[in-house]
Amino acid sequence: MKKQGILNSHLAKIFADLGHTDRVVIADCGLPIPDGVKRVDLSLRIGEPSFLEVLDVVESDLVVERITIAEEILTHNSTIADSLKERYTSIDMCSHEDFKREVAKAKVVIRTGEATPYANVILHAGVIF
């Protein structure tokens, strides 16, 4: 049995297989997930687990080169937006409609119980060297 890191076997396998620039989405409970994109649904009930709780765990296991967020988060969810701006220096922004199209390019979408507007992020994998 693993003693540290991600215990979820699906996520551990996906993360081990990621390459440079591969995409991982952490999503609120309302983001539509395109057919054909792997999903790991962690949602238990509204608000649990939260977007930031999941992001904290994923960040501890994944090298993130940059992120992409929907520009609407800046005006509709300043709490999450501020947290993302504190964590990352390389942030791409696009409209929410464009964001949803970009989700189709992800290796996995991790669905949380988050129920606040636009609490979604695309993490672009970096390299450890």
Swiss-Prot record:
It is found in: Cytoplasm. It catalyses: beta-D-ribopyranose = beta-D-ribofuranose. It holds the Pfam family RbsD_FucU. Pathway: Carbohydrate metabolism; D-ribose degradation; D-ribose 5-phosphate from beta-D-ribopyranose: step 1/2. GO terms for molecular function: D-ribose pyranase activity; intramolecular lyase activity; monosaccharide binding. GO terms for biological process: D-ribose catabolic process. The active site is at residue 20. GO terms for cellular component: cytosol. Its main location: cytoplasm. SUPFAM superfamilies: RbsD-like. Substrate binds at residues 28, 96, 118-120. InterPro entries: D-ribose_pyranase, RbsD-like_sf, RbsD_FucU. It comes from the Bacteria. Its EC number is 5.4.99.62. It is an enzyme of class 5 (isomerase). Keywords: Carbohydrate metabolism, Cytoplasm, Isomerase. Belongs to the RbsD / FucU family. RbsD subfamily. Homodecamer. NCBIfam families: PRK11797.1 (NF008761). Catalyzes the interconversion of beta-pyran and beta-furan forms of D-ribose. This is D-ribose pyranase. It comes from Exiguobacterium sp. (strain ATCC BAA-1283 / AT1b).
